[in-house]
A protein has these predicted regions:
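Glycine-rich beta->alpha junctions and the first turn(s) of the following alpha-helix
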Residues: 9, 202-303, 321
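C-terminal helix-coil-helix/basic helical segment that borders enzyme active sites and/or dimer interfaces
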Residues: 27-30, 284-287, 298-325
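A short, Trp-centered hydrophobic/proline-enriched beta-strand micro-motif
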Residues: 127-135
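A short core secondary-structure module
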Residues: 156-157, 161-206
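Amphipathic, small/basic residue-rich leader segments at the start of a protein or domain
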Residues: 1-98, 118-126, 286-291, 298
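N-terminal glycine-rich flavin-associated loop
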Residues: 96-115, 141
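A structural signal for short hydrophobic beta-strand segments in well-ordered beta-sheet cores
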Residues: 149-152
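Short Ser/Thr-interspersed hydrophobic loop/turn segments at strand-loop and sheet-helix junctions
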Residues: 60, 83-88, 179-180, 195-201, ...
Length: 325
């Protein structure tokens, strides 16, 4: 696209946001309830949150750079950047937060079958299904591929037994994308990236209470859980190839950097540096303290990106424990 085309898109985007983003959705996020996570049992905190989500869903802006066929808006990367900038300019809250968007979606776009993309990506984009990630295990520590959760091959399905830990919001998730050992003889090429419903018989969760009193993480138990190898025509119950799930996990890791960057700092227009220039902050001490906080936030983002770059470089080495298990 030419510069003039992009500027026209910016003007159109700015106009759309002014018309569709309610004032209540331009306030800072104070807690998890301020962001809509979607899912089978989800509810909206306010009419404004519902209106903002529905406007973005209908426009394809919950996943703006995904193809339109899978619920996105089909934006190019430059257009997507402009949309993020314009949303940051008005401090717009995310219309939908989802591990399906940040993690599973990119993996399905790269490795998934057309049937998987049509089903799962559209469900994610519409906020219909909430996903969690099953990676870390109590006995694995930093050596993630030493996992013991095992899927016994029963022909058209697996019977899975094992335990995951530090599973973010497993108690509120509908489905899980889960690393399961399916070949005990091959450490790296004996893992399958499975997809299954958290309501399957044998799946249970136990929240882990932190010192803060919050419980964003869970232990997840799988006791004789039946995981189908297929959910219908061209919809395998796993991503990529059987016993090659490690390839999918490594690819997915690259997209965790984007999530950490987004939560750690995001667009500079929304950083505290923009806040310190507002008329209400006349106290020089407060301005200095907020400026230092902003520097810390920028440093955190830079260190997060460096961490993820180093982690991605360790292609065949054991992963350190994920920030978001």
């Amino acid at each position: 696209m030419s510069d003039s085309d992009l500027e026209a898109f910016r003007a159109e985007t700015r106009e759309w946001l002014e018309a569709n983003c309610p004032p209540e959705m331009r306030e800072p996020v104070r807690d998890e309830g301020d962001v809509y996570w979607g899912g089978r049992n989800a509810s909206f905190k306010s009419d404004a949150q519902k209106a903002w989500f529905e406007a973005c869903r209908d426009k394809g802006y919950t996943v703006p750079e995904w193809p339109k066929a899978y619920g996105g808006a089909g934006l190019t990367p430059p257009e997507g950047k402009i949309l993020r900038q314009e949303m940051a300019r008005i401090n717009a809250r995310p219309p939908l937060s989802s591990f399906g968007i940040w993690m599973l979606g990119p993996a399905l776009l790269h490795f998934g079958t057309e049937g998987q993309k049509q089903k799962f990506l559209n469900e994610i984009a519409r906020g219909e299904i909430r996903w969690c990630q099953g990676y870390s295990e109590p006995g694995s520590g930093s050596d993630l591929v030493s996992m013991q959760t095992f899927g016994e091959d029963k022909g058209d399905h697996w019977v899975v037994n094992g335990q995951k830990i530090w599973t973010s919001y497993a108690d509120e998730a509908d489905w899980i994308f889960c690393l399961v050992r399916t070949d005990k003889e091959n450490k790296y090429q004996g893992i399958t990236f499975m997809l299954f419903d958290m309501e399957n018989e044998g799946v249970s969760t136990k929240p882990i209470k932190l010192i803060s009193g919050n419980s964003p993480f869970c232990e997840t138990f799988m006791d004789d859980v039946t995981v189908p190898k297929s959910y219908g025509e061209d919809i395998p119950g796993y991503v990529g190839e059987i016993n090659r799930g490690w390839d999918v996990a490594k690819y997915l890791l690259g997209h965790e950097r984007e999530m950490i960057s987004a939560t750690g700092g995001g667009d500079r227009a929304s950083s505290l540096g923009a806040v310190t220039s507002r008329a209400g902050l006349l106290d020089p001490v407060l301005r200095a303290e907020m400026a230092m906080f902003d520097v810390d936030a920028l440093s955190f983002t830079a260190m997060s990106e460096k961490f993820m770059d180093e982690l991605k470089a360790r292609i065949e080495a054991p992963l350190v424990t994920h920030l978001h298990a």
